[in-house]
Amino acid sequence: MLSLRPALRLLQAPLRCWAVPKAHVSAKPAETPTSPAEQAVGLSFIFITFLGPAGWILSHVENYKKRPRA
């Protein structure tokens, strides 16, 4: 049993609780506030980036189904 103790300690090491450092979160307002126009551009860009390709694929599903097999 004495020879298994170091191996057992190695296996239990990942199971021990790790001390997670505290995040440095600032409660101050932004130095340069984002204007409504910038927010609108950003939201539009995100919308187009994520939903644009999905919309393209969904609108062309019938074409993909009819594509001749090679």
Swiss-Prot record:
Transit peptide: where? 1-24
> Cytoplasm among the record's keywords?
no
InterPro entries of this UniProt entry? Cyt_c_oxidase_su8, Cyt_c_oxidase_su8_sf
- Bilayer disposition of the protein: Single-pass membrane protein
Q: Mitochondrial matrix compartment: which residues?
A: 25-35
Which Pfam families does this UniProt record tie to the protein? COX8 (PF02285)
Give the chief site where it resides. mitochondrion
Pathways per UniProt: Energy metabolism; oxidative phosphorylation
Q: Which CDD domains does the entry mention?
A: Cyt_c_Oxidase_VIII
Annotated membrane-spanning segments are: 36-59
Record GO cellular component, one term: respiratory chain complex IV
The protein's matches in Gene3D superfamilies, at most eight in alphabetical order, are given as:
Cytochrome c oxidase, subunit 8
Q: Where in the cell is it found?
A: Mitochondrion inner membrane
* Keywords linked to the UniProt accession: Membrane, Mitochondrion, Mitochondrion inner membrane, Transit peptide, Transmembrane, Transmembrane helix
Which residues face the membrane's Mitochondrial intermembrane side?
Answer: 60-70
GO annotation (BP), single? mitochondrial electron transport, cytochrome c to oxygen
Q: What does this protein do?
A: Component of the cytochrome c oxidase, the last enzyme in the mitochondrial electron transport chain which drives oxidative phosphorylation. The respiratory chain contains 3 multisubunit complexes succinate dehydrogenase (complex II, CII), ubiquinol-cytochrome c oxidoreductase (cytochrome b-c1 complex, complex III, CIII) and cytochrome c oxidase (complex IV, CIV), that cooperate to transfer electrons derived from NADH and succinate to molecular oxygen, creating an electrochemical gradient over the inner membrane that drives transmembrane transport and the ATP synthase.
Q: How does it assemble?
A: Component of the cytochrome c oxidase (complex IV, CIV), a multisubunit enzyme composed of 14 subunits. The complex is composed of a catalytic core of 3 subunits MT-CO1, MT-CO2 and MT-CO3, encoded in the mitochondrial DNA, and 11 supernumerary subunits COX4I, COX5A, COX5B, COX6A, COX6B, COX6C, COX7A, COX7B, COX7C, COX8 and NDUFA4, which are encoded in the nuclear genome.
* Family note: Belongs to the cytochrome c oxidase VIII family.
What protein does this entry describe?
Cytochrome c oxidase subunit 8B, mitochondrial
Organism of origin is: Ateles belzebuth (White-bellied spider monkey)
Name of encoding gene: COX8B
